Every structure is written in structure tokens, then in C-alpha cells.
């Protein structure tokens, strides 16, 4: 097996955040633990014309961010207990919660903000590509939930 990962088609995403909610619901996380973030970028201006009508050039687009399943993940290198590791069978970066001490070193190292602290459990959490599902041939819940099919999961070429 090769490196697994996500493909995001920005042209299809409407910013509905169904992917994010599906992930949180599957794992029963508190509202402050978001492992798949949807970020909105917006800009442009409105102009009132002399005849009282408006002209606009506003825009908005979205990006859905989970874990990038990096080739050389700095979060793994930063983890002092070895709880963060990259699986050899599929390249997914996961956290062994038995080893995790919730120190946050992985979160400080990750340039994408993937690991977050679960304050109730005092453990770090991150998108793991729904490894319990994908290792049995299924798809991550965010991929299945997306109504616009903006997310895909599979081998990275």
C-alpha cells in the first residue's frame, strides 16, 4: 500500500461544514474540538452608483483542512513520547492516546494546526483519516458526508 491522503476540490465546496460536523459527531467530540476545519476566504467591494443601484465584485471561497498526512511530519518528530507516529501500511499520521501526555508539542510543531488538545481527556486529537474505517476498506466520514463530493480519499500519487 502507498501513502493515503485527502484530495479537496475547492471548486465544489460550498462551505456548508457538513464534513466538520460529521467528524465531530462520529467521535463525539466537544464543540471546541474541530479536526476538519472549513475556512472561508472573502473579499471584494460594493459600490453605490449615481443612479442608486449597487455594483459589486465580492467573492468567497472555502477550503477544508484536516491532516495533510505529511511525508515527513514534524508533529511526529516533536512528540516526546512517540504517541504521534506515521503508519507504515498507509502513511496515515495517528496518535496513540495511551502514550499521549497532552503536552501540545505536536500542535506547536504542525504548520497546519492539525493537532488540538482535548481538555476533558488531556490528550491531543487530530484527523487520522478515520483509520478505523479506512483500514477496513471504508471511507473517512467527512468524505462520505460531503454533499458536494468536494472531498476524496485514496492513494497519493
Give, region by region, the residue ranges found by the protein language model.
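Non-ligating segments of multi-cofactor redox enzymes
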Residues: 1-157
Amino acid at each position: 500500500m502507498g501513502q493515503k491522503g485527502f484530495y479537496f476540490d475547492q471548486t465544489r465546496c460550498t462551505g456548508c461544514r457538513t464534513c466538520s460536523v460529521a467528524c465531530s459527531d462520529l467521535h463525539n467530540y466537544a464543540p471546541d474540538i474541530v479536526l476538519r476545519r472549513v475556512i472561508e476566504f472573502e473579499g471584494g467591494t460594493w459600490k453605490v452608483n449615481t443612479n442608486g443601484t449597487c455594483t459589486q465584485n465580492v467573492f468567497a471561497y472555502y477550503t477544508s483542512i484536516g491532516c495533510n498526512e505529511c511525508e515527513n511530519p514534524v508533529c511526529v518528530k516533536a512528540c516526546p513520547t512517540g504517541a504521534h507516529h506515521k503508519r507504515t501500511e498507509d502513511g496515515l499520521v495517528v496518535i496513540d492516546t495511551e502514550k499521549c501526555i497532552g503536552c501540545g508539542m505536536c500542535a506547536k510543531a504542525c504548520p497546519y494546526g492539525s493537532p488540538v488538545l482535548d481538555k476533558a481527556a488531556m490528550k491531543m486529537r487530530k484527523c487520522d483519516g478515520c483509520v478505523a474505517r479506512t483500514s477496513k476498506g471504508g471511507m473517512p466520514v467527512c468524505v462520505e458526508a460531503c454533499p458536494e463530493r468536494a472531498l476524496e480519499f485514496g492513494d497519493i500519487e
